[in-house]
A protein has these predicted regions:
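Bacterial Sec-dependent N-terminal signal peptides
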Residues: 2-50, 282-286
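A generic structural signal for short, solvent-exposed coil/turn residues
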Residues: 10, 46, 54, 79, ...
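Domain-level signature for proteins that mediate thiol-based redox and metal-cofactor handling
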Residues: 14-15, 19-22, 44, 77, ...
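Short N-terminal helix-initiation segments at or just after the protein's N-terminus
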Residues: 24-33, 59-65, 200-201
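Local sequence-structure signature of Cys/Sec-based thiol-disulfide redox active-site neighborhoods
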Residues: 38-79, 83-85, 90
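Short, conserved sequence motifs used for protein processing/export or organelle targeting and
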Residues: 86-286
């Protein structure tokens, strides 16, 4: 049974439009080096692997949250599904005492979580598993949302100097459309005592969103406008992110999130890709 969080989710994705909202940027200290992108080995190819996003709304004071943690762990051990999704944990249930909490996580849950914890939502929408946290329910939704080929491919490079993270992103369209790019910083291995934990691994929290960059749209969730791209077109954008002192950069990675405008003008997740800090991720071709 899900635990009702006594807050109101005031900004559901169903109500999200393309209205711009000014956001004060994070300012890194010191010089920010923007790394070079990896070479595209197949410039004429636009058949890209597709990954959906699983967004876990959770927190260390949530005694029911280990139920979803158990299902996500089991999902990660299914070879048929590991390449079909990226998992993000938004620690938003409690700000006090949760070392994985961040304002970025709170923004995500404000936008997409119904207010019940734990909850798993999909592709930056309010679509969720309902009352079931079973692995079979999650895989059924993955099967429904996953595509054989993505509408856009992602290549990226990330580097760190001090607390300054520099990220370089290139996207290549397989389908004509209007695209946006955002980058999120995820941290692994955060130790925090989990209410309701029955095993020690539940006290280690990974894929926790710690920071976001991507300008002004809806709390930075949807990202920077890249404009209209035709099939085969590429677009590039660089980002800088200031990492908080509480974030252990050596345990972090970058999730590149690309959203595409639908016929109603609202943005939906088109693809996402993980990039190691100090490394690169090349286009993932089928």
């Amino acid at each position: 049974m899900k635990l009702l969080k006594l807050i109101v989710a005031v900004c559901l994705a169903a109500m999200v439009s393309c209205t711009e909202k000014p956001v004060e940027p994070d300012v890194p200290t010191g010089d920010v080096a923007i790394p070079e992108l990896p070479v595209d080995p197949q410039p004429g190819n636009t058949s890209f692997a597709h990954r959906i996003m699983l967004l876990q709304h959770t927190g260390t004071d949530c005694s029911n949250c280990p139920n979803l943690m158990t299902s996500l762990k089991a999902l990660s051990e299914l070879d048929a599904y590991v390449d079909k999704y990226q998992h993000v944990a938004a620690h938003s249930y409690n700000s006090d005492g949760d070392p994985a909490y961040s304002q970025a996580a709170a923004n995500l849950s404000q936008a997409f979580c119904s207010g019940y914890y734990p909850e798993l939502t999909f592709n930056l929408t309010t679509r969720n598993t309902g009352t079931s946290l079973a692995v079979s329910t999650i895989t059924d939704i993955i099967d429904e949302l996953h595509k054989d080929t993505a509408d856009v491919g992602i290549a990226a490079a990330a580097g760190l100097a001090g607390n300054a993270l520099g990220v370089n992103v290139q996207i290549k369209a397989a389908k004509a459309g209007q695209y946006r790019i955002a980058v999120w910083v995820l941290e692994d291995g955060i130790r925090g005592k989990q209410a309701g934990a029955s095993e020690d691994w539940m006290n280690t929290h990974s894929n926790a969103v710690r920071a976001m960059a991507g300008a002004t749209l809806n709390m930075r969730i949807y990202g920077e406008k890249m404009g209209e791209l035709q099939a085969g077109d590429t677009a590039e954008k660089s980002f800088t992110v200031a990492l908080d002192e509480s974030v252990k950069a050596e345990n972090c990675k970058v999730l590149v999130v690309v959203n595409a405008a639908g016929s109603d003008g609202r943005y939906d997740l088109a693809n996402c890709a993980l990039c190691p800090i100090g490394g690169t991720v090349a286009y993932d071709y089928n």
